[in-house]
Amino acid sequence: MSGNTIGKLFTVTTFGESHGPALGAIVDGCPPGLALSEADLQRDLDRRRPGTSKFTTQRKEPDQVRILSGVFEGRTTGTPIGLLIENTDQRSKDYAEIARRFRPGHADYTYLQKYGIRDYRGGGRSSARETAMRVAAGGIARKYLRERLGVTVQGCLTQLGPIELGIKDWMAVDDNPFFCADPERVPDLESFMQDLRKAGNSIGAAVTVVARGCPPGLGEPVFDRLDADLAHALMSINAVKGVELGAGFASVMQHGSEHRDELTPEGFASNNAGGVLGGLSTGQDVVTRIALKPTSSIVVPGRTIDTEGEPVPVVTKGRHDPCVGIRAVPIAEAMVALTLMDHWLRHRAQCADVQPETPPIPAANR
């Protein structure tokens, strides 16, 4: 299997399966001298960790990360950073019934068609369990971006099923189990999710991630545009079915006179571009939004076929998220941070000496 590495200069390779003994990652290209400890990575892992609320999967994993290499006396050495998280709460017996039948909406069928073999225990490599390592690796990128460049990356839930959510208070995001920046709507979310659980069903969601403080010029046209690489990174997250930057699909309804982000001596007048023009960052907030499908791991009976091609019923057992979008917030943050980190190193390698005659202009008022 290839395709397990992301990045050009700041690379992350992950390994491991949902019910294997452990998950791991190799982070290569991190500059030396960055103060780094396991505690620096644990905060975001705890935000993603399963079993932290009644609205997510009840699989109990401590997700304690270990740094195996690349750090000496509390600082990165410039060598590959090895990360490891042990799996401790596998219940593989829950998946015995699907060993020879395909769950609709999952990768069971496609993995078997491609490889001729599949790990049916919790989806194996295709499980979102793999994203724990992305969050750990993303913690390294986030720390570097924040401390060396002043770049911050923050996400929140902006829609859960029919409930649209505003971004009213970023400080409230970590104070509720939904990563919601619209705290007045939290009771509505709780009520909706309780009804959903009773029905044994699932729901989709949307997550918005905003990166602030990005310097202008990040991106490599034409095929490694910043927006293209952000879309690539975000689409690699399990269950993501769509990615927007800035106004996104709403651009279809805008006139050019509205959509263009006019430049003034005081700064950009708007940010419909989402902080990227011509594949390069503008210095404005980089604003991304992802749509996540509802998981098909539900107890509502459905139809499928077995490995012999015969029709069989399917009811998913095991422990699953009724809305995968909730725990996707720290995952999406990590993927944005990893992309920005890689592009910063690439920009620095080629354009460190560039001094444009026009200084950067301020971002639009948020």
Swiss-Prot record:
Q: Does the keyword Flavoprotein apply?
A: yes
Pathway per its UniProt entry is:
Metabolic intermediate biosynthesis; chorismate biosynthesis; chorismate from D-erythrose 4-phosphate and phosphoenolpyruvate: step 7/7
Quote the InterPro entries the UniProt record gives.
Answer: Chorismate_synth (IPR000453), Chorismate_synth_AroC_sf (IPR035904), Chorismate_synthase_CS (IPR020541)
GO CC field: cytosol
GO process annotations (BP): amino acid biosynthetic process; aromatic amino acid family biosynthetic process; chorismate biosynthetic process
Keywords, sorted A to Z = Amino-acid biosynthesis, Aromatic amino acid biosynthesis, FAD, Flavoprotein, FMN, Lyase, NADP
Q: What class of enzyme is it?
A: lyase
Pfam family of this protein, just one? Chorismate_synt
* PROSITE patterns, alphabetized: CHORISMATE_SYNTHASE_1 (PS00787), CHORISMATE_SYNTHASE_3 (PS00789)
Positions of NADP(+) binding? R48
Swiss-Prot/TrEMBL catalytic activity = 5-O-(1-carboxyvinyl)-3-phosphoshikimate = chorismate + phosphate
Q: What EC number(s) has UniProt assigned to this enzyme?
A: 4.2.3.5
Cofactor binding note:
Reduced FMN (FMNH(2)).
Would you identify the family this protein belongs to, as annotated?
A: Belongs to the chorismate synthase family.
HAMAP family cross-referenced by the UniProt entry: Chorismate_synth (MF_00300)
Summarize the subunit comment: Homotetramer.
In Swiss-Prot or TrEMBL terms, this protein is called: Chorismate synthase
Source organism per UniProt: Alkalilimnicola ehrlichii (strain ATCC BAA-1101 / DSM 17681 / MLHE-1)
Its organism's taxonomic lineage begins at:
Bacteria, Pseudomonadati, Pseudomonadota, Gammaproteobacteria, Chromatiales
